[in-house]
């Protein structure tokens, strides 16, 4: 099970990395369960809304979402997990942003791999499996 981070989705949509696009298409073809956090979806929706071409970008986002298994809503248990992660990272002196904490919580709670182009940030989260498909 994979959760895609916002930066990876954008790179796939803009086809900024042949390696990334090939891996994404391969995982889809193999039937790998690929999900988005509702937090990632929010970040993407915000980007579309503020863009110079919202209609075109909304269509592009809708097309991207077609093979995605589901958008996972941030629920009560995710909030509890996020609270634990944020407190732990703050105690260690290595906090990350609140949206990233929420995304990490959803992935870690479900024992999913977070696919990101920012391993340095997500590798701080104990017990979170992290992959970068651009490598």
What are these model-derived regions, one by one?
Residues 1-36, 48-64:
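Short, well-structured N-terminal submotif of metal-dependent ribonuclease cores
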Residues 8-9, 40, 78, 103, ...:
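Alpha-helix capping/helix-boundary segments
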